[in-house]
């Protein structure tokens, strides 16, 4: 089957936003107008096409990123609808990794909200061009220009309107196009009858002012346009559009549009903007990767002629076809039934069938081309972030950064029958979601699951019950602490056992130093002259890694430590890998005496919105919870407080805030960083853990 749409006519976009800004409804409308669905499903009625899991329909939030394909103006648009709830950050992150552009949806009453900041920051990290859609213009309190100002104030984004609303709230009836300088007036409820008219007289001055601002902002990103602008020459609409496209693709400019997805206004114009301003796979730099045979960096330009290279970005268990692997093709062509190499794992995989997904319905296809997003059936060893390539042209593409889980729960099966099923269920769920970890406590035999927040674990336990029919008792949530060293030290690990027959002998000197936050564990071999033979070096590293899984103070995993093996000795007969593993773990224990070990706790960025009269209460809440206020701003009659607070102090805060503000206060929290716990708290944690052991 030949390629249906050329690469220039392909767009891979994500729809991202804060929870409840109307992302899924916006996606629904896109599918309606592009002819993918014939009846619109409302999220708040639990009938949305994209929210296809039972829990999503019950909770009215999007949990997994459903991928779908639509067509608009002779272009193919692959859309990924991502969740806005902070506990599902990995879904957003893995979508951004494989997208070329994104639509950020704002609630035009609230503007930029906490999770908008998180997804915006992630999109900036991945260099994803964005357009902004200020949604819910029909809502009471909708304020388009306020929303635009929050993009400047909270995100420091060079964002400018390319549209203005005509009316707002119940009176929202049309949109001014600042490029054509025309008004689009909606005359029916489905948003399909649109009249293009001259701009109403009462809006003309404002439209001219914002058109001028737009031209100036775009000219600042392009020298040729700047010269024309300064010399007073007219910049044509075509030049303006080309300038916006170039600056948007270079992530220097963010066009802002407005509308109401629920009231069917502005979505088609937003689709036009996706085509006009967001990049095709040809507009973005070629993907880079490492050739595993040479360790050299290589690129794969977006072209069907190049060797096949793709990134698996999501694993999903489908009740009808089994394990689905979603992947983005960066270069080359892939046919069903062919073999590929998973270069991340060094395993050969057979592509059974290839499916084009539409939320949770599917269409089987024979071939995928560069720039496509599809799902494959039949891959056994592939997990999130793995590279799939042509066997003759290996490359490992940059993987997906997986955030560390911050919260854990103990789960135990209710019956013997549940016990066997629980292991399989947890393994399948962990395959789908890399931020979900499953561990068994060696000493107690308990199963501990960790994730990004209470809702995250709640949904997974719920899925275990519904999809895998496993009943389990769940313990209270616990904080995932970490341990580290705060000082440098040198330590010896010496292990010798001789009791008849072959003995054991391992001797190492290791220098331990604190590493930068987030860098994890780094091992350096500085042995000179073979005092520790080469074949035992990996055993030393392995011994350290295994020991660091249970830290020296309270048994929490150790992070951000550098270890340099610089000296040691061995025995010709008695030295073995086991002996050197044990020696390394003894060196770590010895180092703990002088390396100032510390316990780290997850700090959350908490954003609390309360009526003005409750501001004093909230400041008291933050202080009482060992938090520190980072900033405050007024919004209407409310105050928004941003603060850093330890996760350990936030359990049950929803109830406290509700009673203090008579149910009018809300809060959101996002994991921000790890920080040393105060000495008094550290002693309590150690005591508690010793008591439990």
Curated annotation (Swiss-Prot):
GO terms for biological process: ribosome disassembly. The keyword Isomerase does not apply. Keywords: Cytoplasm, Elongation factor, GTP-binding, Nucleotide-binding, Protein biosynthesis. Its main location: cytoplasm. GTP binds at residues 17-24, 81-85, 135-138. One of its GO terms (molecular function) is GTP binding. The keyword Transferase does not apply. Residues 8-282 form the tr-type G domain. GO terms for cellular component: cytoplasm. It comes from the Bacteria. InterPro entries: EF-G-like_DII (IPR053905), EFG_II (IPR041095), EFG_III (IPR009022), EFG_III/V (IPR035647), EFG_IV (IPR047872), EFG_V (IPR035649), EFG_V-like (IPR000640), G_TR_CS (IPR031157). CDD domains: EF-G, EFG_III, EFG_mtEFG1_IV, EFG_mtEFG_C, EFG_mtEFG_II. It holds the Pfam family EFG_C. It is found in: Cytoplasm. Catalyzes the GTP-dependent ribosomal translocation step during translation elongation. During this step, the ribosome changes from the pre-translocational (PRE) to the post-translocational (POST) state as the newly formed A-site-bound peptidyl-tRNA and P-site-bound deacylated tRNA move to the P and E sites, respectively. Catalyzes the coordinated movement of the two tRNA molecules, the mRNA and conformational changes in the ribosome. Belongs to the TRAFAC class translation factor GTPase superfamily. Classic translation factor GTPase family. EF-G/EF-2 subfamily. This is Elongation factor G. It comes from Streptococcus pneumoniae (strain ATCC 700669 / Spain 23F-1). The lineage of its organism: Bacteria, Bacillati, Bacillota, Bacilli, Lactobacillales.
């Amino acid at each position: 089957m030949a390629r249906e749409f050329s690469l220039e006519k392909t767009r891979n976009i994500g729809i991202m936003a804060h929870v409840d800004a109307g992302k899924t409804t916006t996606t629904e409308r896109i599918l309606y107008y592009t002819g993918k669905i014939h009846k619109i499903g409302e999220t708040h009625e639990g009938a949305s096409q994209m929210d296809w899991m039972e829990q999503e329909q019950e909770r009215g939030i999007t949990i997994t990123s459903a991928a779908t394909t639509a067509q608009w103006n002779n272009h193919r648009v692959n859309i990924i609808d991502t969740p806005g709830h902070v506990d599902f950050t990995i879904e957003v992150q893995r979508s951004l990794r494989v997208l070329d552009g994104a639509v950020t949806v704002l609630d035009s009453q609230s503007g930029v909200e906490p999770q908008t900041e998180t997804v915006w920051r992630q999109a900036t990290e991945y260099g994803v061009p964005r357009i902004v859609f200020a949604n819910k213009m029909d809502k009471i309190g909708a304020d388009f220009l306020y929303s635009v100002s929050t993009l400047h104030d909270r995100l420091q984004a060079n964002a400018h309107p390319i549209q203005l609303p005509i009316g707002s709230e119940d009176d929202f009836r049309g949109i001014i196009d600042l490029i054509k300088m025309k008004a689009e007036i909606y005359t029916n409820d489905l948003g399909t009858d649109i009249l293009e008219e001259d701009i109403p007289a009462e809006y003309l001055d404002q439209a001219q002012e914002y058109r001028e601002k737009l031209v100036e902002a775009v000219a600042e990103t392009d020298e040729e346009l700047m010269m024309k602008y300064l010399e007073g020459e007219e910049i044509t609409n075509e030049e303006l559009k080309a300038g916006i496209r170039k600056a948007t693709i270079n992530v220097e400019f963010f066009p802002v549009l407005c509308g109401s997805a629920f009231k069917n206004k502005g979505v088609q114009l937003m689709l036009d903007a996706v085509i006009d301003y967001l990049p095709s796979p040809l507009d973005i730099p070629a993907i880079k990767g490492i050739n595993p045979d040479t360790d050299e960096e290589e690129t794969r330009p977006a072209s069907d002629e190049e060797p096949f290279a793709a990134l698996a970005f999501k694993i999903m268990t489908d009740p009808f076809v089994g394990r689905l692997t979603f992947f983005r093709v960066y270069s080359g062509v892939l046919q069903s039934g062919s073999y590929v190499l998973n270069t991340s794992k060094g395993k050969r995989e057979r592509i059974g069938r290839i499916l084009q997904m539409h939320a949770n319905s599917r269409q089987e296809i024979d071939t995928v081309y560069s720039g496509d997003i599809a799902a494959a059936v039949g891959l056994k060893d592939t997990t999130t972030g793995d590279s799939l390539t042509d066997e003759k042209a290996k490359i490992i593409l940059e993987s997906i950064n997986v955030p560390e889980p911050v919260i854990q729960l103990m789960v135990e099966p209710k019956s013997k029958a549940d016990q066997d099923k629980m292991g399989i269920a947890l393994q399948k769920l962990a395959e789908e979601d890399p931020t979900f970890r499953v561990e068994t406590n060696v000493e107690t035999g308990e199963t501990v699951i960790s994730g990004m927040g209470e809702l995250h674990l709640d949904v997974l336990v719920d899925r275990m019950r519904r999809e895998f029919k496993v009943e389990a008792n769940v313990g209270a949530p616990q904080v995932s602490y970490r341990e580290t060293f705060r000082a440098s030290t040198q330590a010896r690990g010496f292990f010798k056992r001789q009791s008849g027959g072959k003995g054991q002998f391992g001797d190492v000197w290791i220098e331990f130093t604190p590493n930068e936050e987030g860098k994890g564990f780094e091992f350096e071999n500085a042995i000179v002259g073979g005092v520790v033979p080469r074949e035992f070096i990996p055993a030393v590293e392995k011994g350290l890694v295994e020991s660091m899984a249970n830290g020296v103070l309270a048994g929490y995993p150790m992070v951000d430590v550098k270890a340099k093996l610089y000296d040691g000795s061995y025995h010709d007969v008695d030295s073995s890998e086991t002996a050197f593993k044990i020696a390394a773990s003894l060196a770590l224990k010895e180092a703990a005496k002088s390396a100032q070990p510390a316990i780290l706790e997850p700090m959350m960025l908490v954003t609390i919105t309360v009526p003005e009269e409750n501001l004093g209460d909230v400041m008291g809440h933050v202080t009482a919870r060992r938090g520190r206020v980072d900033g405050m701003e007024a919004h209407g009659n409310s105050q928004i407080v941003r603060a850093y607070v330890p996760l350990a102090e936030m359990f049950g805060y929803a109830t406290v805030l509700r009673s203090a503000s008579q149910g009018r206060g809300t809060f959101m929290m996002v994991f921000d960083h790890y920080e040393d716990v105060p000495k008094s708290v550290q002693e309590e944690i150690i005591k508690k853990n010793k008591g439990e052991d």
